[in-house]
């Protein structure tokens, strides 16, 4: 996976350290977690350092951690090894990606800027002398060789390279960086493009701000002597006074104010610089915000959120040659939650579709169970029917044996009726009918209603047999006329 190029000086320092430790594969992980402050890595305690290592995925590789620790120690003791003696430079405030590739300038500074005198009024920032070939050629043979930092072309290696030409270092003032006017006590400020974005956002927000009553402000200052002593003179200055803006910037700063207990050498980040600039611009529009720092801080953060994203996206697209393109993402809104409201119908439709799918699956399962029960019942009924048929066949054979002429009926001579005529023998045959009806009643009680349709045929055979026998006998028997004696 290709490693992204550093875009700020803080990222460049991290890039050089990881390059020294041969750990460039972790560069993207550090940037994604916001680890572009090398000083934070150096000052972190044991627990904090291990937590950072876990965030970037290095905790499971102790040898990589040791290599990084060694590179950090080398960076602290001998930063010259990394070509980065940038101890007094704002780490995250100067974007590098504004430079087009192959440009002989660095952050809008021409090669001649490095030859300026070091006796300027403003505090100076030291920059490394990593020379580009175009800069060296433009200077001439008689001048001292001085370099500037430049990107290599895309076809070559993506590494940041440069070479030292002399041991001396030239100075660079904030004015050379294109930063707007700022108090002389501070060397940290936004560049002109970011400050312009802040001013535009404040101009859009100014009409929506509530108007402050000057009498209320004066009453507040009268009751608060300490606050009046600090900022009371600002309200007495006229708008044409050139020192009024400087005083407003001095007392409106949210981060790194002159009376704060910030550690020496701890530089402001890009977010903090943006918030300070927004607070200053807001206080210039409405001086009364100096007395309401809570409200000022909230408004400045709102401006910073909008400006930071838009400015970062704009400068990134400028590097790719796509200018004046609007941001494709939606800026976070303070008033409502439209994204949540739009997602509710979608979630409802998804839940409804899932419920319909579950209902369909449950109906299929019920149908399958019903079919299985039907098959089991059919099998049980078939087995019961077979048993009934076997039983009926046995009863039928038994009844047939009793009615057979060979030995099924008892002889008439045994009853002493051998001399009687045939018509007198009929009652003896009819006396046997209740026996068959008793058998029929017992069979009907043996079986359930489920198999009546199947057993009716067998029972019908058993019922009809004796009646048919009686009918045949009646046809054969001829009654004799009584003797007329």
From Swiss-Prot:
Pfam families the UniProt entry points to: Nab1, NCD2, SAM_NCD1
Spans annotated as NCD2: 220-309
GO BP, sorted A to Z: endochondral ossification; myelination; negative regulation of DNA-templated transcription; regulation of DNA-templated transcription; regulation of epidermis development; Schwann cell differentiation
Claim: Transport is one of the keywords in the record: no
Residue numbers spanned by region Necessary for nuclear localization: 391-422
Molecular-function GO terms, alphabetical: transcription coregulator activity
Keywords, in A-Z order: Isopeptide bond, Nucleus, Phosphoprotein, Repressor, Transcription, Transcription regulation, Ubl conjugation
Region: NCD1, residue numbers: 4-82
Cellular compartments per GO CC: nucleus
Low complexity: bias regions: 403-414
InterPro entries: Nab1_C, NAB_co-repressor_dom, NAB_fam, Nab_N, NCD2_sf
Residues modified as Phosphoserine: 171, 182, 327, 404
Chief place of localization: nucleus
Function summary: Acts as a transcriptional repressor for zinc finger transcription factors EGR1 and EGR2. Also represses multiple types of non-EGR1 activation domains (in vitro).
Protein name in the entry: NGFI-A-binding protein 1
Organism whose genome encodes this protein: Rattus norvegicus
